[in-house]
Amino acid sequence: MHFHERFDVIVVGGGHAGTEAALASARMGSKTLLLTHNIDTLGQMSCNPAIGGIGKGHLVKEIDALGGAMAVATDHAGIQFRTLNSSKGPAVRATRAQADRALYRAKIQQILQNQPNLRLFQQAVDDLIVGNDRVIGVVTQMGLAFEAPAIVLTAGTFLSGKIHIGLENYSGGRAGDPPSISLADRLRELPIRVGRLKTGTPPRIDANTINFDLMTEQKGDDPLPVMSFIGDVKDHPKQISCFITHTNERTHDIIRGGLDRSPMYSGVIEGIGPRYCPSIEDKINRFADKSSHQIFIEPEGLNTNEIYPNGISTSLPFDVQLNLVRSIQGMENAEIIRPGYAIEYDYFDPRDLKNSLETKAISGLFFAGQINGTTGYEEAGAQGLLAGMNASLQVQGKEAWCPRRDEAYLGVLVDDLSTLGTKEPYRMFTSRAEYRLLLREDNADLRLTEKGRELGLVDDDRWAKFNAKREAIELELQRLRSQWIHPNSPLVDALNPHLNTPITREATFEELLRRPELDYPKLMSVEGFGPAIEDQRAAEQVQIQVKYSGYIQRQQDEIDKAIRHEKTGLPQDLDYQEVPGLSNEVIAKLNDHKPDTVGQASRISGITPAAISILLVHLKKRGLLRKSA
């Protein structure tokens, strides 16, 4: 049975990747269908109730700069906001928000329901329709076929999902939801490498049974940060505190005593878990010398008693979970509302994807989110936006687009995945970006919004606000560069008390701002140097661009040099066995990864600069040197 309408793009899955994919495609004018097994769970935060953090917050800002929904929803749902690394340089500062699950889900659903060109339909997908190595459509659980020339698959942890609590296990996509078995079996028939990964979640605790007086209170920042570039503090709901407590030696003894019934330590779970979000069992095992581990007690919302104890993700049996929770200070009488569990699921090797996130094997089929081996809402949302955008571009007969590593953390994410692949759930960090001084949270809009507008992702309201901010920055920078102060100027008497060394030569206002003892607000507070621009984000940008201009230019020079190699394309049918001088190890790795460009090849582990030089010489001799599209 065929559905009575055809679509341009079909998105399968309504999590963070799926919602951003569907919204991106629809914003670009493509007739889009979002298929989900349950419309009520669209935008569900399946694990921790938080958005942002180191590296992750950068991705959220980039999603926002390209017109996405995640930051906007966070501003309307965030019940505690903090800027991490606030005492460090701007490159590693990151915004993190504790979110009310219900408010976040409601805002995402509101955005979806009001998006032109987007249809929602509740049905699980069981099969793909493929012909001549091209996707044609999907078939749902009830045998209903939907047709579209582009499909974005965002199945999360649902593909052959198996939930583990102790030595007991059962099939599930997440607690309370069925897995996608038929779809997983169908995907395993495709010529794409498949593996198993694992993630986990902690038990949820009843707040009424916690003694918060025995814990350390952690308040949000004041003034409150805002996640979206078009957001406002007025969007935020009521703000509340989180709390901090710790495990202890008794906790660790309880965990060690239960390891014989742990699915991870008894060989029941095959999948590899996230290195940077380990279970409490892993922490006790890997860091045996530590006598305690920090636990963040995070509220799940304003109108619920559920608490998320961040730091004790576990799949131990329920009796062990209860004992370990009650061994922790402040939770001696705690009651568990939902047990913690581990979930094992299929993922597909992202090296089998183009950097547009289209599969190399099946035209028109795009993968985004945990299906590509990543972990985290932010990583999923960023991939979803890119996949939905490129699906729409393909349908429109336009060229695919993906930012370079020097343009966005999204570019770093996709390049890492498609070039290097991953054997464990991939999480974004600022340390993964070699050009992180340019890839800051604060300038994500300046880096990406103009491109987003060109692609059709950015609406008129966001575009107008962006242009006003950009113009304010440029005008203020011009003013600071063009205004001078002389040693004999009457302004000097007001300025010198703020300086470590008095002015002895004439200088521009820009040169004054470069002094370490001055910041933009302080300089503008001195009589004769104002007025300051009113937009605080624009003012922050002025200060950063002035103070870091030398470092920024140096990094830009490095990028220009790297781009020359980055754009040198490699033929997909190139037989590396025929390249004289390459070692067997290098040949094997190049044949395995099949990089699209010399830049990608250079980032494969074990590929030396000498090997790249040999490759370039071979390409030149054979007349195969070409620039990538």
UniProtKB/Swiss-Prot annotation:
PROSITE patterns, per database record: GIDA_1, GIDA_2
Residues noted as binding NAD(+) in the record, renumbered to the chain: 273-287
InterPro entries reported for this sequence: FAD/NAD-bd_sf, GIDA_C_N, MnmG, MnmG-rel, MnmG-rel_CS, MnmG_C, MnmG_C_subdom, MnmG_C_subdom_sf
GO molecular function: flavin adenine dinucleotide binding
Gene3D superfamilies: FAD/NAD(P)-binding domain, GidA associated domain, C-terminal subdomain, tRNA uridine 5-carboxymethylaminomethyl modification enzyme MnmG/GidA
BP term (GO), one: tRNA methylation
Domain of life: Bacteria
Binding site for FAD: G13, G14, G15, H16, A17, G18, V125, S180, Q370
SMART domains associated with the record: GIDA_assoc_3 (SM01228)
Keywords tagged on the record: Cytoplasm, FAD, Flavoprotein, NAD, tRNA processing
One annotated Gene Ontology cellular component of this protein: cytosol
Cofactor(s) the protein needs: FAD
Compartments it resides in: Cytoplasm
Entry-linked HAMAP family: MnmG_GidA
Function: NAD-binding protein involved in the addition of a carboxymethylaminomethyl (cmnm) group at the wobble position (U34) of certain tRNAs, forming tRNA-cmnm(5)s(2)U34.
Family of this protein: Belongs to the MnmG family.
Subunit structure comment from the entry: Homodimer. Heterotetramer of two MnmE and two MnmG subunits.
PANTHER family membership: GLUCOSE INHIBITED DIVISION PROTEIN A, PROTEIN MTO1 HOMOLOG, MITOCHONDRIAL
Protein name, UniProt field: tRNA uridine 5-carboxymethylaminomethyl modification enzyme MnmG
Organism whose genome encodes this protein: Shewanella loihica (strain ATCC BAA-1088 / PV-4)
Lineage of the organism: Bacteria, Pseudomonadati, Pseudomonadota, Gammaproteobacteria, Alteromonadales
